[in-house]
């Protein structure tokens, strides 16, 4: 019997495991990312640090720019749409994007509903702060989950919090008695069958990446040690002094996350990292967008 579209999309996302996905704003950056060993790139007009700095409404990027990036690399290309904006998603699907990120980094288009991702052929990535959010997005059809963190800050603390929360809640479900599953599903606001999957398997039904504030090789290794199966790096690379070297170092850190000697070597002489923000100083908390 043939594999259904949902399983195919989950398998596509599985192929990115262990990798680093980098935000790029043009084809030159995309080529640097691919040469550094990125497993995919995220095409967008402004990295989160600039969206945060400039303010205003952040929307889907220009399809022309996305096409130029897609034509410049051989690795998968992702692009972001606003939460709930299914027409932006239809446009990206039409232009042949590899993955769509329904992203809280862009200004939400709908404050009540997320996109029905099962209506699309292209796989979706979604952010989550906890297990309930993750399972709701998977229930809607997401093929990959990432922490929300706080994008554009260069501060990994929120991503750490979200990853620890998800992993702690997975352990709680795994250790529960079978008769507790329905109550847990009610508490989490998550589909019963997905809570049951977590109870039986001790993990999410899809890959779980880290995102939001990853700025150094050590940050990438930390997130993988905490349970992430790969890492998104947004502003952290191309807002730093030496993007090529930092990109390579973060890819190495994701591969050798358990080897302090390698991490020491790749962390040396990277130049200035991106400017970081204290979370308490931020006006807009992107992670609070969506539910």
Curated annotation (Swiss-Prot):
The active site is at 80 (schiff-base intermediate with d-ribose 5-phosphate). It catalyses: aldehydo-D-ribose 5-phosphate + D-glyceraldehyde 3-phosphate + L-glutamine = pyridoxal 5'-phosphate + L-glutamate + phosphate + 3 H2O + H(+). The keyword Lyase applies. It comes from the Bacteria. GO terms for biological process: amino acid metabolic process; pyridoxal phosphate biosynthetic process; pyridoxine biosynthetic process. GO terms for molecular function: pyridoxal 5'-phosphate synthase (glutamine hydrolysing) activity. Its EC number is 4.3.3.6. Keywords: Lyase, Pyridoxal phosphate, Schiff base. Transmembrane segments: none annotated. D-glyceraldehyde 3-phosphate binds at residue 164. D-ribose 5-phosphate binds at residues 23, 152, 213, 234-235. SUPFAM superfamilies: Ribulose-phoshate binding barrel (SSF51366). It is an enzyme of class 4 (lyase). InterPro entries: Aldolase_TIM, PdxS/SNZ, PdxS/SNZ_N, RibuloseP-bd_barrel. Disulfide bonds: none annotated. Gene3D superfamilies: Aldolase class I. The keyword Lyase applies. PROSITE patterns: PDXS_SNZ_1, PDXS_SNZ_2. Pathway: Cofactor biosynthesis; pyridoxal 5'-phosphate biosynthesis. Pfam families: SOR_SNZ. Belongs to the PdxS/SNZ family. HAMAP family: PdxS. Catalyzes the formation of pyridoxal 5'-phosphate from ribose 5-phosphate (RBP), glyceraldehyde 3-phosphate (G3P) and ammonia. The ammonia is provided by the PdxT subunit. Can also use ribulose 5-phosphate and dihydroxyacetone phosphate as substrates, resulting from enzyme-catalyzed isomerization of RBP and G3P, respectively. In the presence of PdxT, forms a dodecamer of heterodimers. This is Pyridoxal 5'-phosphate synthase subunit PdxS. It comes from Clostridium acetobutylicum (strain ATCC 824 / DSM 792 / JCM 1419 / IAM 19013 / LMG 5710 / NBRC 13948 / NRRL B-527 / VKM B-1787 / 2291 / W).
